[in-house]
């Protein structure tokens, strides 16, 4: 009979999840049936797929499907499938642990507020563990396709932190889950109730879901189950139906099925494509970002079918990585049933599907972003809040759609009082000053640092808008986004300041004159700061601050250097340029000290002031001091 009775403990996170579900999801208990039916559907899909390569797994054929039953006397509900089944090891691995990445992040988000936690758990996808919302004991009996009847397995738990595993004899391939209902859950011991839940959440599943027929027993004065089974769902692939025949409610229910989420999608597109390649696509934009959005190992949200036969779950070849948040189904009429991931990478049909699906997703985003309807614009704002940083990756990954992606970008800006990223590049160009020919931006590690940085002072004085870039991906993105509609993107904190036509001849002449007057100060400052600064120069970008640091042309910014170090990567060893404001009293005092041919005290005072101006500029841009104690000593000497 195989391995003996064995008792094991749940993974720690499972205990916590079970507790949360029992206490947080009581208001939406019926989702347990949706989740268990979805799992059963996946198991049958996997059998179909593995059966292509090994027909013996089908064990003589027979109709594939799901059966639901209940026993009012025993107070049990049963969900059975004849899918791929599980071995003993698979039962322990799949039912005793949470395999999905992002688990730690998930638990860190929980607030203790039942309403918020319920939504969060629904977003995360509770799967098999949802059974414990209504059951105080769950029994799972299973046998994997292709193994002897003697290698069946029984898994059982009361949801109390432990589970048992036994070897059993099981003639049928597949899995049967029996829920022993909690007190007060008799509502689910009703054929009408169970049917209504299936038709609400799982009507679209392309497998027949069956229950026993019922008839009225006059003697017992109640409905009695018959031996005959009846299909209670439509059992047709939703994506294969004409759009006109599918309601919004059905689209939403299908999204919840494939995404394992409780909420509604932000938008969807359903199309049949004919021509060089023939395929059907049903693609959804989620409302919320998953916890593992930034995980390099995370799975794609696309399911691939060939002629309605499930092929694979995470078909990442069908969309570029920057659209990895998209959920949905693609059903090809051209790919072979025995398609492998290697074939997918080389297939011309897959390339056509990828290009077509990318255009559809970008089209969905454009229709929301460009809409005059406030509700649609709000949808795009929601999308950008959750997925904007990922979309920016497309500028470096998808050259063919680079211009379309650039139009979809949104930024914070000095035009707005808050940190909301709502300004498009087209919005910015529409507000440019007469004579302005550049799009100005500043990058910083957060909105406060960007908004209050000294580099913005002359732009604020002249009323010129500056984009505030604070996402970690922005510096990388800018290496691919050099211009938009023939307007160059220019950092206000890089290189010499060139305001072009925003500056008149009189201003330029005055600047040249001042630079000549302060040349002795600049020359001496270069010598003193040779170890810290690449260059020292007089600037006209400052109106209130005495100094600022800028990156030289071709060098990485201080912001990017700090981000690289935080990520554990080596940043190029470059020095910033120190710029001094000739109109500021501190700089004028510094120039006066430079002109005095005094002794050691005057030299020390000059160097202290100069180093303090450099260090203050470094702090103002969000940097950290290499030697804070030295800075404090210099400030103390100046204050004494």
UniProtKB/Swiss-Prot annotation:
Entry annotated with the keyword Phosphoprotein: no
Chaperone in keyword set: yes
Region described as B: spans on this chain: 342-562
Entry-linked SMART domains: HATPase_c (SM00387)
Cellular localization per UniProt: Cytoplasm
Coiled coil spans: none
PROSITE patterns recorded: HSP90
Transmembrane segments: none
Annotated stretches, region: A: 1-341
GO cellular component: cytoplasm
MF terms in GO: ATP binding; ATP hydrolysis activity; ATP-dependent protein folding chaperone; unfolded protein binding
Region span, C: 563-640
InterPro entries documented for this protein: HATPase_C_sf, Heat_shock_protein_90_CS, HSP90_C, Hsp90_fam, Hsp90_N, Ribosomal_Su5_D2-typ_SF
Keywords attached to this entry: ATP-binding, Chaperone, Cytoplasm, Nucleotide-binding, Stress response
Main localization category: cytoplasm
Assembly and binders: Homodimer.
Function as written in the Swiss-Prot or TrEMBL entry: Molecular chaperone. Has ATPase activity.
Family: Belongs to the heat shock protein 90 family.
PANTHER family, per the entry: HEAT SHOCK PROTEIN 90 FAMILY MEMBER (PTHR11528)
Full protein name: Chaperone protein HtpG
Lineage of the species this protein comes from: Bacteria, Pseudomonadati, Pseudomonadota, Betaproteobacteria, Burkholderiales
């Amino acid at each position: 009979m195989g391995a003996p009775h064995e008792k094991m403990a749940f993974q720690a996170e499972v205990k916590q999840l079970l507790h949360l579900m029992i206490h947080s999801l009581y208001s939406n208990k019926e989702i347990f049936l949706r989740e268990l039916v979805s799992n059963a559907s996946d198991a049958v899909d996997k059998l179909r797929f593995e059966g292509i390569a090994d027909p013996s797994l089908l064990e003589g054929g027979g109709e594939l499907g799901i059966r639901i039953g209940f026993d009012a006397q025993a107070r049990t509900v049963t969900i059975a499938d004849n899918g791929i089944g599980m071995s003993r090891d698979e039962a322990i691995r799949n039912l005793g642990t949470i395999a999905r990445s992002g688990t730690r992040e998930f638990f860190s988000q929980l607030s203790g507020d039942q309403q918020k936690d319920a939504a969060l758990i629904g977003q995360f996808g509770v799967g098999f563990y949802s059974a414990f919302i209504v059951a105080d004991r769950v029994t799972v009996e299973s046998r994997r396709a292709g193994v002897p009847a003697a290698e069946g397995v029984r898994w059982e738990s009361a949801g109390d932190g432990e589970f048992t595993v036994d070897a059993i004899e099981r003639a049928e391939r597949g899995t049967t889950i029996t829920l022993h209902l909690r007190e007060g859950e008799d509502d689910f011991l009703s054929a009408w109730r169970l049917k209504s839940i299936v038709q609400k959440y799982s009507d679209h599943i392309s497998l027949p879901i069956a229950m026993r027929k019922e008839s009225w027993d006059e003697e017992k004065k109640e409905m009695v189950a018959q031996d005959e089974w009846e299909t209670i769902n439509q059992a047709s692939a939703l994506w294969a139906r004409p759009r006109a025949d599918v309601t919004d409610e059905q689209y939403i229910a299908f999204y919840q099925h494939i995404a394992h989420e409780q909420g509604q999608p932000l938008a969807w597109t359903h199309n049949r494509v004919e021509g060089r390649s023939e395929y059907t696509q049903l693609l959804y934009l989620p409302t919320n970002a998953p916890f593992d959005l930034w995980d390099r190992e995370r799975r794609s949200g696309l399911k691939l079918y060939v002629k309605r036969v499930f092929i694979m779950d995470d078909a990442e070849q069908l969309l570029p990585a920057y659209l990895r948040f998209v959920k949905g189904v693609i059903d090809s009429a051209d790919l072979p049933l025995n398609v492998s991931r290697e074939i997918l990478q080389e297939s011309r049909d897959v390339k056509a599907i990828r290009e077509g699906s990318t255009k559809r997703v970008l089209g969905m985003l454009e229709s929301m972003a460009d809409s005059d309807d406030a509700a649609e614009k709000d949808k795009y704002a929601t999308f950008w809040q959750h997925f904007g940083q990922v979309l920016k990756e497309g500028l470096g990954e998808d050259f063919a759609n680079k211009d379309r992606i650039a139009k979809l970008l949104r930024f914070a800006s000095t035009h707005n009082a808050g940190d909301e990223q709502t300004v498009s590049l087209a919005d910015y160009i529409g507000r440019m000053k007469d004579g302005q020919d550049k799009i100005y931006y500043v990058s910083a590690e957060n909105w406060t640092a960007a908004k209050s940085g000294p580099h913005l002072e002359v732009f604020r004085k002249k009323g010129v808008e500056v984009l505030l870039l604070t996402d970690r991906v922005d510096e990388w993105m800018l290496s691919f986004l050099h211009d938009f509609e023939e307007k160059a993107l220019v950092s206000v904190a890089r290189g010499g300041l060139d305001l072009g036509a925003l500056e008149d001849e009189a201003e330029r002449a005055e600047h040249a004159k001042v630079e000549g007057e302060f040349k002795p100060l600049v020359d001496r400052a270069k010598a003193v700061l040779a170890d810290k600064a690449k260059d020292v120069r007089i600037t006209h970008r400052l109106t209130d601050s005495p100094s600022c640091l800028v990156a030289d042309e071709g060098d990485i910014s201080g912001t990017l250097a700090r981000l690289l170090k935080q990520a554990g990567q080596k940043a190029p060893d470059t020095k910033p340029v120190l710029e001094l404001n000739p109109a500021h009293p501190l700089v004028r005092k510094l120039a006066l000290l430079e002109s005095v041919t005094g002794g050691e005290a005057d030299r020390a005072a000059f160097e202290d002031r100069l180093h303090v101006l450099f260090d203050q500029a470094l702090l103002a841009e969000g940097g950290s001091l290499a030697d804070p104690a030295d800075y404090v000593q210099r400030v103390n000497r100046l204050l004494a």
